[in-house]
Amino acid sequence: MVNIDLKDAGGLPLAYLGDAVWELTVREYFVEKGYKINTMNKKVKKLVNAKAQSVIFKSILEDLDEDYKAVARRAKNSNIKSFPRSCSIMEYREATAFEALIAAFYINGETCRIKKILENHISEGEK
């Protein structure tokens, strides 16, 4: 795993790493299911976007311990310069916090936790 001290790490670099980890986890999930590329791509896009990540973030926030909440808070309050038009500023901030959490789980070797979050947020029709 990566050797980063989460207490010193900035929110945006963590979100950058978490974005890659989340997308890879989602892609692996659907590849293992054996979908065709077009179908896989549509399913991945439903989970790898700011709106979806914002929803997931809000659903897991209460279950986090204080160290992870601190990581999320730092990322959410980071000095983000630009925002996409596809979501609100708050959704984008929450998605950034979610991605930072995914990086924190990854750094701490909690990849099973990332997969569990994914499985809990895939609708029955998506499985």
From Swiss-Prot:
Record keywords: Endonuclease, Hydrolase, Nuclease
InterPro entries linked: Mini3_fam, RNase_III_dom, RNase_III_sf
Molecular function GO terms recorded: ribonuclease III activity; rRNA binding
Coiled-coil zones: none
Function: Might be a ribonuclease involved in RNA processing.
Family the UniProt entry places it in: Belongs to the MrnC RNase family.
Protein name (Swiss-Prot/TrEMBL): Mini-ribonuclease 3-like protein
Organism of provenance: Ilyobacter polytropus (strain ATCC 51220 / DSM 2926 / LMG 16218 / CuHBu1)
Lineage per the UniProt record: Bacteria, Fusobacteriati, Fusobacteriota, Fusobacteriia, Fusobacteriales
